[in-house]
Each structure stands twice: as structure tokens, then as C-alpha cells.
Amino acid sequence: MDLFKIEANYIDIFNKEIYPASIAIANGHIASIEKINATLDEYVLPGFIDAHIHIESSFLVPSNFAHLVVAHGTVATISDPHEIANVNGIDGINFMINNSKKTEFKFFFGAPSCVPALSQEFETSGYVLNDKDIDELMKLDDIYYLAEVMDFKGVINKDIEIINKINSALKRNKVVDGHAPGLSPNLTLKYASSGISTDHECLTIEDARYKLSLGMKILIREGSAAKNFESLHPLISECSKKYCDSLMFCFDDAHPNDILNGHINLIVARAIKHGHDFFDVLKIACINPVLHYKIPVGLLRIGDPADFIITKDIKTFKINKTYINGKLVFNDGISLIPLINEIPINNFNCSKKSISDFKFSTKNKMIPVIKCISNQIITHKTMIDSNLLAPDFQSNIAEDILKIAIINRYKDNSKISIGFIKNFGIRNGAIGSTVAHDSHNIILVGSNDEYLCKAANTIIQNKGGLCALNNEKTIIMELPISGLMSTLSAERVASQYIKLNDFCKNVLGSRLDDPLMTLSFMSLTVVPHLKINDKGLFDVDSFCFVDY
């Protein structure tokens, strides 16, 4: 029998009390919890859970992601593998599941409901998962829920394909995650009544309050891409009596340079610093995801799996030790989860481009331009006089209007989609990426066509990755796994990403906090307001392509 004991101040979240205790662990489970008379400087509590994340956004395979986040007390994630599913289909999902099983960390994957985010009528992905594919996935024990339903128009209009996907989960008593930013109350009601139970896309507290009143659960998101904590954290105190079971924390997208510094523990510390009830905050971080998603993660009760964390600081939640299934996976600054060098998979069929491929023309006097916002994945739409791009529709550096392009990476010789974007701030150069939500085609923005072409061909030569360049220098961060993930450690990936980002800001001149991250969401046509994909400029509000 594998038996050991720890002594620490036991944080009993359920009964809202803290007391010194001796906790016995046997065969990976909590065997006993006994009060003791002692003065102790350590605290023990259940591990943290990220209630919605795309592991691929960290540029790390699951095992290497786990190696990093156990340092911050995270023991489990509710993971949506729709990034790799858009590239490699079910093979990509299986890649994530199989890699995750090589570690003690608890990954709970969902079946991606919208691959692509919209139908192939609207964008080109590497694969399409139809309702029959989803039904087969939902039969698997490794699939715990239906991941975020982004096609809100399909839900509201009762499109048979998306309704079948939702019902496939519900009939198996598996939950359905939502994604519904900016809907009117009437449309939100229709969306929620389909059986969708969560949303992590609330941008305003009013939207969140209304969804809570409908019985939905709200995930307070504070990740690398979108940051909504400041807008939504008052819900924690508002909901302490009525809706405390209905809140969770998530990152959604987490870049390695951010999670080197912390994960859900940072949100917990921040919420407590804002004066919210200590135990309510921990309930949101540790307990609510377990109960909602019905996942086998321990809550530090007798008989539970021994998933817990130890800290000396219940203000910052700097972690000293992390245990999963009774095994020590992080110990005083050292992660004990092994790094795994996976064999890459990919899906890339795109040949070299020429400068002339990036030409643009229109006869329209006024043309729509994407207006990006730092640290947000939404955009605004603005109209400009086409004379600002005279004489040959190039980027206008003085007005900060840059050409943006999407290249279909899956079907060679497809027409390049071209538009214009404001607020990027690049003065002399280009950046590009195959991390382009959600279909992950090649997305580029630059100060002229020559730079765009050079960045495109650098990415094509490497079959994916992140790129930034000017006349003097080209930097490429290789992402050999589906053009989304690296085989390297988090520390090395973070170092590369920081170097790229610094180059984008300090050399190319971008004023955005994270230019590559912002660029990656300019193609996500299920988040308002104006986006671009491989088939053209898309107005999310009117749900149609925009003619130039």
C-alpha cells in the first residue's frame, strides 16, 4: 500500500474553515483527515482547474503544458482541442489525447462542436467534423463534453447539424459549452434554451448577469488573448449566495510567456485582493468545474483522488508542492512531470508565392477596414476613403492602415484574401502566422507587398510557424506540430515568443501589447465585428461577406 501523511492547515472550502490537520493518503486517494493541535506554516487545498482552455494556444503539446502549469497549482484542465481539429481532424484530437495520457496531469477533452468555426461555405479548414463525427466522439470515455458552440446563428435558427451535435452530448448526460458574445437578450434566450450551459465570452457584466438569470454558468476569463476579469469580477460577490455555483475561472488561450508567471493561481490571488470572499473564490477555482463537468478530480475529501496543492502564502498562492493522484508532480520549484518530444503531425499544402499575388484593387470610393484593439479579440469596423491607399492600394504607413492577407494552407493555388487593418502600427516589415483562429490558414500583415510575400514564403518553407521580418532580419518560430505547437520546452518556446514579440514592437513598431496574438484572432469570424478569412472580409454582425 502506498501510504504517506502530510500535516498542514487544511482549507475546508465546503465548510468555510481552516484548521491544522493530518491528512493520510493511501493508493492515490485521501484516506483520512484529522484535526490536530499544532502550529503549522503550510496550507493544503484542492488543486486549481482551468475551466476552458485550448492547450494548443500555449504552443506546447499537452505533456509539456502540464510540466509548466503544475508549478502554479493547476491539476486539471477542461480542454477544447478545436485548434488541432481544424488542421488534422480526429487524428489531431487523438494526438492530444494520446500525448496527455503520458503524464499524471488530468486533461479532460471535449468534442469540438464547430470545425470549422463556421461552415465550409464561409471558410476553409483542414477538416470538417459533421454531426456523425461528433456522435462517434461523444461515445468515447475520453471525451467529457461538447466544446464551445460558436455557430450561434445555427443554434438560433435550429440548424439540424448543430442541433444534432448538441443532442448527441445531452443524451449522454454530457454538458455543452457555449460561445455567445454580444447577442441580444432575445437571441441569448434562444441560444441558452438549446441546452448550452456555459459561456466564457461575456464582455460586459450585464451580459453575464442575464445569462446567469437564464441558468447558464459564466467563466471569468483572464488569459493571454482576452482579458475580462476587471469587467466581470464583481459577479463573485454578487453571486455569493444565489449564483456562487455558477462561476468558474479560465484562461481560454494561454501563451507560454504568460503561464511561466502563473495560471489560475494568479486569478485567485487577484480576486481575493479585490476583497471577494476567500472561500467563494476557491470554490470557483477548485470545486465548481469538477461538479459541472463531472470529472474525476479530488476535492480534498475522504475517498477523493489525492489531487491537492500546498502553499505557504494564501495571498499570492505561490505554490510549494502539487500532488495528482497522490503523486508529487511539483516540488519546491522543480516540475517532476517529464518533457516529451513528440513526433510531429501536420497538414500543409501550399506552394511559394510571388509579390504580384498580393495585389489589391477596387472601384469603390469607401472601403471597410478592420480596427483591432490591444488585448481584445473583438474588432471594430471603420470606413476609409480608398484614395488613402492610392495609387496602387498599398499600406498607408502614415495613417497606420496596413494590408492584411490570408492564404489557404490546405488547397494550393487558392486566391489570396486581402483586406486592410488599422492600429497595428508596423512601419517597416511584416509578421505572419499559421496560428490563425480557427481554421489556421496563413495570416499576414505588413507595410508592403514585398514584406508580405517574404513572410508568407518563410512560413511556407517551414510548413507553419510564427514569423516577423524586415530588410535586415527574419525571425521564425517553428511550430512543426500542425503549424500550432512546438516540440520544445515551455521555457524555450517562451523565450522564442518573447524575442518575436519584442522584435514586432521595438523594431517593426507595433503598438499592440501582443501583436502576434492579436493577429491570430483577426480571422475568427464568430467574434464581432469585422474579420477576414480565406474567403474574404466578413461582417460578423450582419453575418455576410463584405464586397469591396
Curated annotation (Swiss-Prot):
EC number of the protein: 3.5.4.2
GO molecular function: adenine deaminase activity
Cofactor field: Mn(2+)
Keyword Manganese belongs to the record: yes
Domain of life the protein comes from: Bacteria
Catalytic activity: adenine + H2O + H(+) = hypoxanthine + NH4(+)
Record InterPro entries: Adenine_deam, Adenine_deam_C, Amidohydro-rel, Metal-dep_hydrolase_composite, Metal_Hydrolase
Pfam families membership: Adenine_deam_C, Amidohydro_1
Signal peptide: none
Keyword Hydrolase tagged: yes
Keywords: Hydrolase, Manganese, Plasmid
Any one of the GO BP annotations: adenine catabolic process
NCBIfam families given in the database record: ade
Similarity remark: Belongs to the metallo-dependent hydrolases superfamily. Adenine deaminase family.
Protein name: Adenine deaminase
Gene name tied to this protein: ade
